[in-house]
Amino acid sequence: MPMHFIFSDEAVLLFDFWRVHSPTGMALSVLVVLLLAVLYEGIKVGKAKLLHKTLESLPATNSQQFILGPDQDSTGSRSTSDNRTRLRWFLCYFGQSLVHVIQVVIGYFVMLAVMSYNTWIFLGVVLGSAVGYYLAYPLLNMT
């Protein structure tokens, strides 16, 4: 395996069964990696939107309390609505954790694809990241 970038239409990507032996196969592989990079950028924006929606849906005092921690002088009693709010916060946090795991897995797949040192794959990742950023980041400003 070369330790420098090469232009080639032959490569083994991520798994042994993903062997590329033709220009058509390389073009399809670049497309798959490009889409993975776009998905990675989309998930980053999705995580930010999910956190923003979660914090908006909670009352201001509760969302600040969950971020900053409970007050020192709070008593041990909690109301039913407080418990529901905590459960909803936990479920949102659990969902964000799952989305984060998916983002990490996709990120490592993209990184390992680049580590094939194939220039076409590298360019696909760069282009996919650019396209994903271009498409996804304007969604952050939408409410």
Curated annotation (Swiss-Prot):
Post-translational modification: Ubiquitinated; ubiquitination and the subsequent proteasomal degradation are prevent by SLC31A1 that stabilizes it.
Transmembrane stretches, start-end: 23-43, 94-114, 120-140
Cellular component per GO, a single term: late endosome
UniProt cross-references to InterPro entries, sorted A to Z: Cop_transporter (IPR007274)
Modified positions (Phosphoserine) in chain numbering: 77
Localization, UniProt: Membrane; Cytoplasmic vesicle membrane; Late endosome membrane; Lysosome membrane
Deleted gene: phenotype: Homozygous knockout mice lacking Slc31a2 grow normally, with no obvious developmental defects.
Phosphothreonine: residues bearing it: 75
The keyword Membrane is assigned to this record: yes
Pfam families, per database record: Ctr (PF04145)
Cytoplasmic side: 44-93, 141-143
Extracellular compartment spans: 1-22, 115-119
Alphabetized UniProt keyword annotations: Copper, Copper transport, Cytoplasmic vesicle, Endosome, Ion transport, Lysosome, Membrane, Phosphoprotein, Transmembrane, Transmembrane helix, Transport, Ubl conjugation
Keyword Transport included in the entry's annotation: yes
Biological process annotations from GO: copper ion import; copper ion transport; intracellular copper ion homeostasis; regulation of copper ion transmembrane transport
Gene Ontology MF terms: copper ion transmembrane transporter activity
Record text about domains: The N-terminal domain may be involved in Cu(2+) acquisition from potential degradation products of proteins in the lysosome.
Entry-linked PANTHER family: PROTEIN SLC31A2, SOLUTE CARRIER FAMILY 31 COPPER TRANSPORTERS
Family label: Belongs to the copper transporter (Ctr) (TC 1.A.56) family. SLC31A subfamily.
Assembly, per entry: Oligomer. Interacts with SLC31A1; this interaction stabilizes SLC31A2 and protects it from ubiquitination and the subsequent degradation.
Protein's job: Does not function as a copper(1+) importer in vivo. However, in vitro functions as a low-affinity copper(1+) importer. Regulator of SLC31A1 which facilitates the cleavage of the SLC31A1 ecto-domain or which stabilizes the truncated form of SLC31A1 (Truncated CTR1 form), thereby drives the SLC31A1 truncated form-dependent endosomal copper export and modulates the copper and cisplatin accumulation via SLC31A1.
Protein's name in the database: Protein SLC31A2
Species of origin: Mus musculus (Mouse)
Gene behind this protein: Slc31a2
